[in-house]
From Swiss-Prot:
Cross-referenced PROSITE patterns: AA_TRANSFER_CLASS_4 (PS00770)
KW Membrane (keyword) present: no
In-chain residues carrying the UniProt-annotated modification N6-(pyridoxal phosphate)lysine: 144
Domain of life where this protein originates: Bacteria
Record-level Gene Ontology MF annotations: D-alanine-2-oxoglutarate aminotransferase activity; pyridoxal phosphate binding
Protein's UniProt keywords contain Transferase: yes
Organism: Bacillus subtilis (strain 168)
InterPro entries in UniProt: Aminotrans_IV, Aminotrans_IV_CS, Aminotransferase-like, BCAT-like_C, BCAT-like_N, Class-IV_PLP-Dep_Aminotrnsfr, D_amino_transT
EC identifiers of the protein: 2.6.1.21
The protein, known as: D-alanine aminotransferase
GO terms for cellular component: cytosol
Amino acid sequence: MKVLVNGRLIGRSEASIDLEDRGYQFGDGIYEVIRVYKGVLFGLREHAERFFRSAAEIGISLPFSIEDLEWDLQKLVQENAVSEGAVYIQTTRGVAPRKHQYEAGLEPQTTAYTFTVKKPEQEQAYGVAAITDEDLRWLRCDIKSLNLLYNVMTKQRAYEAGAFEAILLRDGVVTEGTSSNVYAVINGTVRTHPANRLILNGITRMNILGLIEKNGIKLDETPVSEEELKQAEEIFISSTTAEIIPVVTLDGQSIGSGKPGPVTKQLQAAFQESIQQAASIS
């Protein structure tokens, strides 16, 4: 397998990380995961733009253009002959003697690799269980940073409880999942938290909002309370690798009929169609 290290394609065994890389020591960096369908990077420009935004928000000046990044990632996918899978890319602030503050002029370190993705067909078709948990993350969740410790801990609690995802609540209001955006269908309207600093504005989320409008479904980007969530007709979550997955039980309680609902199914079908169109056009 080839990996990308600072613009160069090398064998994975040749790649190394300096012990004083600030990403390794502080989680001082940003990342993206981009899905590959039929050899095509889905939503590449949107992911690349968000990558640059995240870098700018934490003061990292990337030494390449969006076009350079897209070209390198496409080469990586081609070199590894990836048909169905994903690319993980991250940039750290660079290497420096360990201290919290940093000097200007550090050289950012960018790495990327490909991996296979198993489409969660069972989960998409039949739905999953989720739990709720308190959202104790920092208040810049709009930045896709490497700092994911609370997400990891909460996802593990969900896993140990036999659930697929943990839905996070801040002051009694739904923000998002540990690795997904969250939507509730209430009185036929799709409700989801607005894209502010409390959530990551997912690329899949943006696609879904476009599909909601295109399909004439009502949308309301306003926070959902815990009580509203548990009484919703439908709940679904979205992410790059999960796509759209129904939540049919929450904290052991059935949601709606306990099966994937009609709005979720409609959006799943529309999303799959958009994937096919993107893969055939490219």
